[in-house]
């Protein structure tokens, strides 16, 4: 899991793309959280939701390669499936909630496109079945 986050989050940070803080590994400014409207509980991925809202309010984010934080991984396949279901549902909830705001911003086409792909990444699975 560490390798995945190093590559994904590092690339997002390095390229100025929207990135998400993982619930167990974000260091937040209280002012940024308040400015973005605080924690919302209308999505299953409140950390993803807050990450995007903070950036939509022009707060800067950065991935720190040299900071190590422990995290818990699912202990069995059922726990993994449950985690992935929450992440999939929450990502799509966040996409429905925030992509209209992303599209209205004065961001580059690439940044908007990548945000769309990032928030809708779990849609690949049903699309594979359909196609």
Model-based region annotation:
Residues 121-131:
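Membrane-embedded multi-pass helical conduit in multi-pass membrane proteins
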Residues 1-44, 77-116, 120:
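Long helical/loop segments within the catalytic core of UDP-sugar-dependent glycosyltransferases
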Residues 41-42, 51-70:
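Catalytic donor-sugar/metal-binding loop of nucleotide-sugar-dependent glycosyltransferases
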Residues 70-73, 77:
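AAA+ P-loop ATPase motor domain of ring mechanoenzymes
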